[in-house]
Amino acid sequence: MALTFPAELRYADSHEYAGPSDEGIKVGISAFAVDQLGDIVFVELPEVGASIEKGSSFGTVESVKAVEEMYAPVSGTVVAANQAVIDTPELLQNDPYQEGWLLKITPADPSQMEQLMDATSYSAKVEGGS
């Protein structure tokens, strides 16, 4: 999979992304994170209605290599969790930005998006190895 970072998304240091969706903000993990994890076998996500806080763990992703926590790029209330990814974790691996999104949230403070990196900055970060 080519490591792509869509320009309409914003990225956290911890490799999660946030971007516009028809239900608020779509949250997932970047192609870089997916590439580092390898074969994904399990995804745990919060329930609809849960509150998540920026920088706090909101779930885990398990691969054949490791179990990693995922951290909220922005604070808000979960309005959708991608059941398809829970049922078929390979969707996350094959298409992290479209079919493999994780959550849709109503943001508590939309200005938190401005604190995240744009695609150019994020690409430079991961290609620089930091």
Curated annotation (Swiss-Prot):
Binds 1 lipoyl cofactor covalently. One of its GO terms (biological process) is glycine decarboxylation via glycine cleavage system. CDD domains: GCS_H. The keyword Nucleus does not apply. It comes from the Bacteria. Its cofactor is (R)-lipoate. GO terms for cellular component: cytosol; glycine cleavage complex. Gene3D superfamilies: 2.40.50.100. The modification N6-lipoyllysine is found at K65. Residues 24-106 form the Lipoyl-binding domain. Transmembrane segments: none annotated. InterPro entries: 2-oxoA_DH_lipoyl-BS, Biotin_lipoyl, GCV_H, GCV_H/Fam206, GCV_H_sub, Single_hybrid_motif. Keywords: Lipoyl. The glycine cleavage system catalyzes the degradation of glycine. The H protein shuttles the methylamine group of glycine from the P protein to the T protein. Belongs to the GcvH family. The glycine cleavage system is composed of four proteins: P, T, L and H. This is Glycine cleavage system H protein. It comes from Synechococcus sp. (strain RCC307). The gene is gcvH.
